[in-house]
Amino acid sequence: LKFVVLICLVIMASTSAQQCGDETCGAGTCCAVFSQNHCRRLSRMYDLCSDHADASPSGNYLFFCPCEPGLHCDRNTWTCTEGSSRSE
């Protein structure tokens, strides 16, 4: 039974992680591309951000991570805000 639990934990950890250059990004982070790839935390309220739709095919973002859950990236200011994800 302990072996089964261990296998489940390994599978859960591997599905929530993202390879980012030589690093593996965990939950609450993304792979942001500068001159090299770096794991960064998801953007918070008023932080600069990338839109979820702007991810590369490999799942990387240019410069900034998307916003953490409950926020959206305002395409006018490129900052995380609350409310509707539509630009007005």
Swiss-Prot record:
Expressed by the venom gland. This is U1-hexatoxin-Iw1d. The modification Pyrrolidone carboxylic acid is found at Q18. It is found in: Secreted. Residues 86-88 form a propeptide. Gene3D superfamilies: Lipase, subunit A. Pfam families: MIT_LIKE_ACTX (PF17556). The keyword Signal applies. Residues 1-17 form the signal peptide. The keyword Membrane does not apply. Keywords: Disulfide bond, Pyrrolidone carboxylic acid, Secreted, Signal. One of its GO terms (cellular component) is extracellular region. Disulfide bonds join C20-C31, C25-C39, C30-C65, C49-C73, C67-C80. Belongs to the MIT-like AcTx family. It comes from Illawarra wisharti. InterPro entries: Atracotoxin.
